[in-house]
């Protein structure tokens, strides 16, 4: 599912909302989650899961085309941990 499909489904289930309004709401939610993660905060959606950022240490990598060793800098990556309710639903 892509974002536009999500917007269409939510709009279909909520006929009192215009699709443009639903799209604005979905975009606002994603923007707030992104901003919180960029600030190093954790975003928890009870029962669904939690978004956070984790540090990936600097390491030596290898260029797959040439085989040359390449230094890869430390970086922050987004991480999602599923909530218990979501895990239970997936494993029914």
From Swiss-Prot:
Annotated function: This protein is one of the two subunits of integration host factor, a specific DNA-binding protein that functions in genetic recombination as well as in transcriptional and translational control.
Protein name: Integration host factor subunit beta
The keyword DNA-binding is assigned to this record: yes
GO MF entries: DNA binding; structural constituent of chromatin
Quaternary state and interactors: Heterodimer of an alpha and a beta chain.
GO BP annotation list: DNA recombination; regulation of DNA-templated transcription; regulation of translation
Source domain of life: Bacteria
A GO CC term attached to the entry: cytosol
Record key words, sorted: DNA recombination, DNA-binding, Transcription, Transcription regulation, Translation regulation
Similarity comment: family membership: Belongs to the bacterial histone-like protein family.
One Pfam family of this chain: Bac_DNA_binding
């Amino acid at each position: 599912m892509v974002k536009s499909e999500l917007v269409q489904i939510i709009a279909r289930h909520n006929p009192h909302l215009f699709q443009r309004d639903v799209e604005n709401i979905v975009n606002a939610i994603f923007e707030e989650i992104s901003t919180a993660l960029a600030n190093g905060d954790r975003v928890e959606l009870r029962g669904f899961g939690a978004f956070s950022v984790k540090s990936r240490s600097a390491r030596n990598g290898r260029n797959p085309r040439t085989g040359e060793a390449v230094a890869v800098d430390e970086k922050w990556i987004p991480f999602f941990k599923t909530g218990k309710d979501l895990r239970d639903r997936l494993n029914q």
